């Protein structure tokens, strides 16, 4: 129970709170781009996952050395995208803090997920896993809600509707499907392929930001960084 309480907070609370704070300072597509670092951190936390061999013994997965070059390509893409965005800004301190918050969440999410995978019962479904983690983290969410009410009062109806849509699409549908896919992965390549699907988040974020939020098209340098990042993630997933 203690492990469930601790790692549920790490996976959910320490993931959503930093990202929610970063939204006030960075455009959505840049948050999605920086968030792709979670794929690198996910690979680095792979040894925390243990799989059951045919002989019944549990063995920790290993970090494949073949993934390191593509991880560097992903990192280069993220750095180029972020640097191109910050280049024309005069006050970059809040932006750097927001990027740091995203990186913190990018570590917390795969770390919490890996540690929960180590203690979850094989018979537990992805939906049951998400529900259990939500219940374990709920006291902290109530505390955060209480502090927010004390400082700014009740949210507007528009905020409630937007939060409901995000919670349903990202917090329920996407999380359950993602956790189900990670449970089906039996080796590092399959696990990396599952996590690589998150790269499409960048493409959708750019397109939807242009369509609905009126954001400017990323600069050529930023587009190059995004291309390197998505390409590195895809190659990481399909490597031999």
Spell out what each predicted region is.
Residues 1, 83-108, 150-165, 218-227:
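Juxtamembrane helix-entry segments on the extracytoplasmic side of multipass membrane proteins
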Residues 1-35, 80, 169-188:
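Specific transmembrane alpha-helical segments of multi-pass solute transporters/efflux pumps
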Residues 9, 13, 17, 39-44, ...:
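Hydrophobic/small/kink-forming positions within alpha-helical transmembrane segments
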Residues 14-23, 76-90, 137-152, 202-218:
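Hydrophobic alpha-helical transmembrane segments in multi-pass integral membrane proteins
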Residues 30-37, 119-137, 171-211, 239:
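Helix-helix packing/entry segments at the starts of transmembrane helices
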Residues 39-67, 185, 190, 201-223:
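C-terminal transmembrane-helix exit sites in multi-pass transporters
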Residues 43-47, 62-85, 220-240:
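Hydrophobic transmembrane alpha-helices of multi-pass small-molecule transport proteins
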Residues 67-77, 97-101, 116, 120-172, ...:
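Hydrophobic alpha-helical transmembrane segments of multi-pass integral membrane proteins
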């Amino acid at each position: 129970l203690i492990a469930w309480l601790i790692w549920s907070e790490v996976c959910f609370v320490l993931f959503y709170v930093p990202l929610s704070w970063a939204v006030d300072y960075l455009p959505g597509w840049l948050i999605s781009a920086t968030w792709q670092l979670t794929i690198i951190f996910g690979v680095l936390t792979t040894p925390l996952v243990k799989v059951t061999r045919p002989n019944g013994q549990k063995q920790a997965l290993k970090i494949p050395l073949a993934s390191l070059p593509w991880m560097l390509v992903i990192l280069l893409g993220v750095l180029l995208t972020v640097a191109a965005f910050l280049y024309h800004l005069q006050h970059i301190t809040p932006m750097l803090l927001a990027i740091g918050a995203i990186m913190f969440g990018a570590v917390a999410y795969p770390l919490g997920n890996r540690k929960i995978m180590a203690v979850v019962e094989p018979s537990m479904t992805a939906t049951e896993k998400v529900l259990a983690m939500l219940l374990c983290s709920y006291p902290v969410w109530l505390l955060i809600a209480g502090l927010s009410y004390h400082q700014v009062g009740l949210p507007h109806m528009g905020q409630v509707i937007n939060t409901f849509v995000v919670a349903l699409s990202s917090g329920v549908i996407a999380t359950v499907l993602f956790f189900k896919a990670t449970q089906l992965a039996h080796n590092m390549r399959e696990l990396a392929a599952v996590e690589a699907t998150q790269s499409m988040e960048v493409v959708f974020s750019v397109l939807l930001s242009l369509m609905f939020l009126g954001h400017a098209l990323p600069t050529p340098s930023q587009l190059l960084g995004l291309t390197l990042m998505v390409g590195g993630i895809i190659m990481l997933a399909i490597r031999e």
